[in-house]
Amino acid sequence: MRDSHSHALTSVSTESDTTMSLFCRRLRLEIDLSRGDVSEPILPVGYRWLEWSPELLDRHAAVKFRCFETEQDGQIFPSLRSADGCRRLMDYISGHAQFVPNATWLLVCDGIAQEGVVDCGSIQGLAPIPDSGAIQNVGIVPEHRGRGLGRALVQAALRGFLASGLTHISLEVTAANEPAVRLYQSLGFRVTKTLYRSVDEC
């Protein structure tokens, strides 16, 4: 999802430090799954899920880079700016003690003729505190957007968290990414906090 709204970034300086610090405005959204089931995701014809396995790490990293390389988050977050950065990020997520494989999915499309299978979306999950899950890096490659795949990815992750006994789920999104914010809210997420992240920390 592309977004070029300038209000996502804020410059801050102090009297004691003339260096300008760049911040991005982020929203934390949360959903409580203990009150109801999550609808089963519906994929268009030709698309299917690949559940997590370590052999898919490089494919997750590659599709993550394709999802974010031309997007605002790809300019803001160092880990999303390069293929190597996305590989390191996937190493970190999948090697984390609180990694949730059930909430981690690769979305593929069975291409036609010489194209073969095309990786077109990715999502990961962590469980940073008891009973709680955190969605990481929802991404659909540009040429497959507008087909409801982002919604399906989030639903698949939510069902995976539930299957792992996690009912309080959160995520963060750049505030200027209004289509993503609307998507999450339509699934039942609500904004609980506004955060200002230093770009150097992102």
What are these regions (language model features)?
Residues 1-6, 161-172:
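Conserved GNAT acetyl-CoA-binding A-motif
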Residues 48-74:
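A short beta-loop-alpha structural element at the N-terminal edge
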Residues 104-106, 114-126, 134-139:
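Conserved beta-strand in the GNAT
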